Amino acid sequence: MDGKEASLSAQERPVSDFPDMLKKFAAAVEANDGAGLAALFTADGVYEDGFYGACTGAAAIAGMVAHFHETGESFRWEFFDPVSDGRAGYAHYRFSYRSKVAGAEGKPVAFEGIGHFALRDGKIARYCEVFDRGVALAQQGFAADRIKRVVEKAAARQNATPEFAAHLRRLAERSA
């Protein structure tokens, strides 16, 4: 550890094993290992899924992984170009699976996104992601009105967050 890193608190130090954390994260989801994924999170950790919303704590995170495998199979998750400063991490990803949803059984679903990891003491305090939900839903052959409902729900959830509400207020002030 160099002098600069030694002067940083443990929370501020770069996570040198962030790529390894991503490998464990992906492997746990692929293997339906909810406990393994939850172990990467802090006790109060939050996994904010792009479809299912926020899951807080080990039991909820493990349950979400089980739900993934109820609605899909043959998961593949690959992370690329990871960067982290010890407090935050980002990685580009490719995610794919075969749908088990009624009416879309066996259809391959693949999309790209960006994962954001808020880190604390070498664990994930919060994970959220950005991807095009419409791309994922369209590959399952869902009707346009169903896709629209899902995307509108995601937009409402996004716009209701305190951060985004403040952003939209600034937009309204600028437009006035």
Question: Where are the language model's segments positioned?
Answer:
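Hydrophobic alpha-helical core bundles mediating ligand binding, dimerization, or RNAP-core interactions
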Residues: L22-F25, V29, F41, V65, ...
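A solvent-exposed, acidic/Ser-Thr-rich amphipathic alpha-helical stretch
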Residues: G34-R87
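Short N-terminal helix-initiation segments at or just after the protein's N-terminus
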Residues: K23-A26, C55-A66, H167-L171
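A short, mixed-charge helix-start or loop-turn motif at secondary-structure junctions
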Residues: S7, F18, Y47-G50
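Short acidic-aromatic low-complexity motifs
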Residues: A10-P14, P19-L40
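A beta-strand edge to alpha-helix "cap/lid" segment located at domain peripheries
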Residues: D2-R13, A66-A176
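Hydrophobic pocket/interface hotspot
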Residues: F25, L37-A38, G45, G57, ...
